[in-house]
Amino acid sequence: MRIDVISLFPEFIAQCAAFGVVGRAQERGLLELQGWNPREHAQGNYRRVDDRPFGGGPGMVMLIEPLRACLDAVQAADARPAPVIYFSPQGRRLTQMLARELAQLPRMVLLCGRYEGVDERFLAQAVDMEISIGDYVLSGGELGAAVVVDVVTRLQEGVLNDAESAAQDSFEGPQGLLDCPHYSHPSSHAWGDVPEVLRSGNHAAIARWRRQQSLGRTWLRRPDLLDEAGLDKHDRRLLEEFRRELAKGDEESGCTPSP
C-alpha cells in the first residue's frame, strides 16, 4: 500500500511512522509512506499557503492554489488512482469497519488541514471523503493522519507477525466486540492471580472464557456496540452467565449490580 500525506508538517507524520508496526511495514516494503508540503508548491517569496477568510473572523484559511499544485504533484508521482481524504469533524467517524475498507485500497492521499481549515472550493472539487477521529478539536489533521496510517497498515497482509493478532483485536469479528483481558507471567502476584482457566491447557475452555469476557466487557463498557438481538444462543448463554457471576460478586461485596 502507498499512502501520501499532504501536510504543512510532513516531518511529524514521518516521525510517528518510524516506529513499531508501521516502521516495520516500511522496512519490509509493505507500506510506502510519502509526505508532501504544500508550502513547497506555493508562489512568491514568502510561499504563502493561507490568508484571511472572506466575511471576517479569526484565524486563517488554507489557500486553493498551493494545495492544488501539491495534489497535482502527488497524483503525478504514482499512476494508481487514490481517493483524497480530508480530516474534519464533519466527516465520517473512523471505525474498525471503515479501517478495513480503507485497507483494501492500493493507495490513498491524506490531506491535513490547519488554521481554520481549507478553502471550501478545494474540498468540493478535490476531496473524495472526509473522516473524523472523534468529537473534539485538534490543531490540525496530522494526528488523524497518523491514526489512519497505523490502523490501516496493521491490517495489511504480512505486517503483523501473527495474523490472529488483528483478528482478535477489539472491534474485529462480525459483532465488533471489545477484546478479552490478557495476562502474562507471573501467574501469581500481589495484585492478583491469572484466571485458572488460562493455566489449564484446555483450549476449548480458554476459547469459551475469552468469548464470554469479550461479550461481558462489551456489555459493561460499550453497550452501544452490543446487538443482543443478533447474538446466537451460545453467546446469549455466555453473556447471561457473565451477568449472573457479576451480580453474585457485587452482592458478596455489598455493591449494587451494574450496569
Curated annotation (Swiss-Prot):
The keyword Transferase applies. S-adenosyl-L-methionine binds at residues 113, 133-138. It comes from the Bacteria. Its EC number is 2.1.1.228. Keywords: Cytoplasm, Methyltransferase, S-adenosyl-L-methionine, Transferase, tRNA processing. This is tRNA (guanine-N(1)-)-methyltransferase. PANTHER family: TRNA (GUANINE-N(1)-)-METHYLTRANSFERASE. The keyword Transit peptide does not apply. Specifically methylates guanosine-37 in various tRNAs. Pfam families: tRNA_m1G_MT. GO terms for molecular function: tRNA (guanine(37)-N1)-methyltransferase activity. It is found in: Cytoplasm. SUPFAM superfamilies: alpha/beta knot. Homodimer. CDD domains: TrmD-like. GO terms for cellular component: cytosol. Its main location: cytoplasm. Belongs to the RNA methyltransferase TrmD family. It is an enzyme of class 2 (transferase). It catalyses: guanosine(37) in tRNA + S-adenosyl-L-methionine = N(1)-methylguanosine(37) in tRNA + S-adenosyl-L-homocysteine + H(+). HAMAP family: TrmD (MF_00605). GO terms for biological process: tRNA N1-guanine methylation. The gene is trmD. It comes from Xanthomonas oryzae pv. oryzae (strain KACC10331 / KXO85).
